[in-house]
Design a protein with these regions (language model features):
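Polytopic alpha-helical membrane-helix bundles and their juxtamembrane interface segments
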Residues: 1-230
Length: 230
């Protein structure tokens, strides 16, 4: 990676954190006015996602000399975020224009499309090959982690959902989200166990952190929705 690309990535990282901090500060300032906070959240969400989409498609364009797999990976992640943006736009229209509860709704179709596309994008990222012994060790460790997390998800999230008094569609979609988060978690673990070229470390660290944040916020949202506290 040349100096120009390093500076560009550094500036992009600074900009991303500046936007995140600004969003958090404004949300805190609007905490006393639930309606304004809702409007702010519904409007800024798609705007931020459009910036992310532009960045991912630019990454695909800039990596055209690094192989087709790299380009496909960035394109898939860009398409994944495009579906998220469509979901947020649909959510905003339902909530602000029609004053209806957007969950469950058609917005969930777009949100759910994000998970397999994003996980597939991670899969297409080029990585160095492991030795046979390392590969078996990694498979065993990943299996243990996924089994443990799967049991925890069943005990604390999936099983309570199945006995919840909420409508069937709400429970069904909530369980699908949990399962897809599990798919995303698998992609994250695979990302952590992969050996990438040094030039990919920075962007992939940000992607990994974003995946962790998404999984955590998803679970908080599901719990609040099912408990009626959202």
């Amino acid at each position: 990676m040349n100096g120009k690309e390093t500076i560009s990535f550094k500036n992009a990282t600074i900009l991303a954190f500046a936007i995140l901090i600004s969003f958090t500060v404004v949300s805190l300032l609007l905490q006393g006015d639930s309606y304004l906070r809702m409007v702010f959240s519904d409007i800024t969400g798609p705007v931020i996602e459009i910036l992310v989409i532009m960045g991912l498609f630019y990454a695909a364009y800039a990596s055209k000399n690094q192989g087709q797999h790299v380009q496909i990976a960035w394109i898939l992640m860009g398409v994944a975020f495009s579906f998220t943006a469509l979901g947020d736009i649909t959510w905003a229209i339902l909530e602000l224009v029609f004053s209806t509860n957007p969950f469950p709704s058609v917005a969930d179709i777009f949100y759910l499309a994000f998970y397999p596309l994003f996980a597939l994008g991670i899969y297409f990222m080029p990585r160095d090959k492991f030795s046979s012994s390392d590969r078996y060790k990694i498979i065993l460790e990943m299996g243990i982690i996924l089994l443990t997390v799967g049991l925890l998800l069943w005990v604390f999230l999936i099983s309570p959902n199945l006995t919840s008094q909420e409508e069937f569609l709400t429970i069904f979609i909530s369980v699908i989200y949990i399962v897809f988060d599990f798919v995303l978690l698998f992609a994250l673990i695979r990302l952590l166990y992969s050996k990438f070229k040094e030039e990919y470390y920075g962007p992939l660290i940000l992607i990994g952190l974003g995946m962790v944040a998404l999984i955590i916020t998803d679970y908080i949202y599901y719990l609040q929705t099912l408990q009626g506290t959202y």
